[in-house]
Amino acid sequence: MRTKYSFYNFLVSLITSVALPIFGFIKVRMFIDLYGSDLNGLQLTIMNVITFLNVFELSYSLAFRQLLFKPLAENDRDRVLSIYNGAVKVFRFTGMAVLIVGALTALLFPMFAESPLGYGETVTMFLILCVPFGLSYFLMGPNFVIIADQKEYKINIWIQTIAILRMVLMVGVILMKLPYIYIFLIEGLQVFIANFIARRIALKNYPWLKENKQLPYDDAFQKNAKYTIIQRLSTLATNNTDNLVITFFMGYTMTSVYGSYSYLTESVSKIINSAITSPINSFGNLFNDSGADSYSVFTEFFNFAVYIASIIGVCIFVVIGRF
């Protein structure tokens, strides 16, 4: 079953990891031709800032899933509910904090670099993209349960379908030469709709998450989350600061140029990650199976992942100059 779930997760991720960049290349080229490089750079920079504001999502996901692996493997619903109820309280508090900090950041963001838009328009664009991420914290609890139970493909296929539909709609907006605000609205709505649908699917598969049992809240999630937040922040500081530095010193136009060229490497990275990260939750289940030879299986997979990544890395190094 672990192999089957890993394969399903990989297949869904791989298809969309290939399809989305194709639409993305078309969309970026058309967006720049119609609205200009500076507006494209503005959008890229806003998304980078929001990535830092949204640091808790991936951190919480990892911390929450780690706690759920064992009770899910043992089918201990009361333990899952106890962890879930404790985590949901933190999610809601964090969602409110992200919305408040996002609003304050939006007011200050136009001062970061010279914007192609007026002050009010820049703040509005930031809020349109930021608010859905804050609201997503009120929806994401059940999503992490289905992911931890190795069935991410059930929600991911819908999330990625919406992402592809988003790209198609954006291309349509550009072809009709509608105002750029529609692009930002589509981007923001996609985040909220994807999380809402994923939540509905997760609750349909785990209706007992809605049970109002008088179980004590488990605070283990809060203890684990603080470590994963630090880990996630270090990753963001390494990989997501380029655009911010370029914008601050060189402006939004150069950010657009840099973002267009880095799009290729980011797309290849997502394809590799789809293969490497798909079995993660299955490994979590495996490590909680006392009868499984988990160490040897993990070692074989790790060696295979390093081998594939090395080959692809060398190929990119050779051809990136010509690109």
Predicted regions and their residues:
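Alpha-helical transmembrane segments of multi-pass membrane proteins
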Residues: 104-107, 116-139, 156, 160, ...
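Membrane-interface junctions at transmembrane-helix termini in multi-pass inner-membrane proteins
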Residues: 3-7, 133-159, 171, 181
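Helix-loop junctions and terminal segments of transmembrane helices
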Residues: 58-74, 147-148, 206-207, 261, ...
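Hydrophobic alpha-helical transmembrane segments
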Residues: 16, 123, 127, 156-204, ...
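N-terminal membrane topogenesis motif
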Residues: 1-24, 41, 78-85, 120-122, ...
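Signature of the first transmembrane helix
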Residues: 5-69, 99-102, 132, 167, ...
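Interhelical loop/hinge segments that connect adjacent transmembrane helices in multipass membrane
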Residues: 1-6, 180-181, 196-240, 244, ...
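Alpha-helical transmembrane segments of multi-pass membrane transport and lipid-handling proteins
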Residues: 18, 88-114, 128, 168-176, ...
